[in-house]
A protein has these predicted regions:
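Conserved class I S-adenosyl-L-methionine
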Residues: 222-231
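Conserved SAM-binding loop of SAM-dependent methyltransferases across substrates and taxa
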Residues: 232-245
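Conserved SAM-binding motif I beta-strand of class I
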Residues: 246-251
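Mobile active-site "lid"/loop adjacent to the S-adenosyl-L-methionine
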Residues: 294-324
Length: 397
């Protein structure tokens, strides 16, 4: 006996957990009424109706997604050494991947720690805790980071909507050390960028697009590039540094464009760069009407599909982007388009983008599909962790 509360689950759920699926929903819990008394984030055993062990994990009676599996091993306690092992294992893997300490260290379920995201910015570590279970275990997370990473500062960016669903409050603070400046400098694919770890989007930088930025930069060499939804310039600046002749950056956010300009200066490519503040669709229409042409167009929009109900409208959004991009792309040029909407699968996205390009009457080919960089591992039974999809098309004229 473990002394943990036993959450009884139905046969369908038992089968899914044994096959590797890591989530339990309230409708699958046989003693849900009794489990309502559990403190959010309690460690529990998920068991058959007769009491046989199936899995161990977090339980939060507040949301519909009540359970998150941590282990299928009955003898595995969930405490300090479990957390230490998971974080050390993840760190060793990243150290094999990257020569410099700028990466996602923990990718939630993908690294076996549901609801925990940790990004490393050199000696500054930024954490997002999105489940009540990880909130309860965070002292062990902090201790593990101090032991293995030895950071100068640990920052909590607990400002996500996911926390509200778990009944958690939002907060941003430095929980360890001193953050002398919230703007840190990172290196990615040989370029340098500034990231604000306190107020920047996500934790300050989108590490997931690292490999895609390198790929796009290689295609843009000796060509003019249009970087739409450029944010702080990750795609376009790496392309300029890799040999693009000129880069036009477009974003609706003034502060994002200011950050992109600073990053262009930081990399010595400012003379190649033009910055346009404006809405993506309208700006692309204006550039089309002006007869502008580019060897490569990069589109990295925010999520168009935030829930299932947004699916049809969101897919049409990607289709329209592709339709607007086609006349901007010169002969034998390229379109790179990314989606961070996990609700749309790869085929749906590909079909709609291709339909948008087809309106040009030009022949084209799909030359690459990609996802996030390997520091964002995908849980094999949880497609939500493989949210990022990136397509590259080449025109054949």
């Amino acid at each position: 006996m473990t002394g943990l509360f036993s959450v009884q689950i139905d046969e369908r759920c038992q089968k899914r957990l044994k096959q590797g699926y890591p989530w339990v929903f309230r409708s699958e819990v046989l003693n849900a009424k009794k489990a309502e008394s559990l403190a959010p984030g309690s460690v529990v055993d998920f068991v058959r109706a007769k009491g046989d062990f199936v899995a161990r994990g977090f339980y939060n009676p507040k949301p519909q997604l009540v359970g998150r599996v941590l282990t299928l091993t009955e003898k595995q306690p969930i405490e300090k050494f479990f957390i230490f092992h998971q974080i050390e294992s993840a760190l060793r893997f990243r150290e094999k991947l990257f020569a410099e300490p700028f990466y996602r260290l923990i990718h939630a379920e993908g690294d076996g720690l549901p609801g925990l995201v940790i990004d490393r910015y050199g000696d500054v570590v930024v954490c997002q805790v999105n489940t009540a279970g990880m909130e309860a275990l965070f002292p062990h997370v902090e201790a593990a980071l101090k032991a293995f990473v030895e950071p100068k500062a640990i920052v909590l960016r607990n400002d996500t909507s996911a926390r509200e669903q778990e009944g958690l409050t939002q907060e941003q603070k430095v929980v360890f050390g001193t953050l002398e400046n919230p703007v840190v400098t990172i290196t990615e694919n040989g370029a340098q960028f500034q990231a604000d770890v306190m107020t920047g989007q996500k934790t300050g930088w989108f590490f997931d697009q690292r490999d895609n930025r390198d790929w796009v930069a290689s295609l843009a060499k000796d060509s003019a590039m249009l970087d739409v939804f450029c944010h702080s310039g990750g795609f376009g600046i790496q392309a300029a540094k890799a040999g693009a002749t000129a880069v036009t950056f477009v974003d609706s956010s003034g502060p994002a464009l200011q950050a992109a300009e600073k990053n262009a200066l930081l990399n010595g490519v400012e003379k190649k760069c033009q910055f346009i503040e404006g809405k993506a669709f309208e700006t692309m229409e204006k550039l089309r009407d002006m007869g502008q042409k580019f060897g490569l167009v990069s589109l990295d929009p925010p999520a168009f599909i935030k829930s299932r109900k947004d699916m049809a409208a969101g897919l049409k959004g990607y289709q329209k982007l592709a339709k607007l991009a086609a006349p901007l792309i010169e002969s034998s040029g390229y379109l790179f388009i990314a989606s961070c909407s996990h609700h749309a699968d790869l085929k749906e996205l590909t079909d709609h983008v291709a339909e948008g390009l087809a309106t040009s009457g030009r022949s084209f080919q799909l030359i690459k599909t990609a996802g996030a960089a390997p520091d964002h591992p995908v849980h094999p039974f949880l497609p939500e962790t493989g949210y990022l999809k990136a397509l590259t098309f080449r025109f054949l004229d």
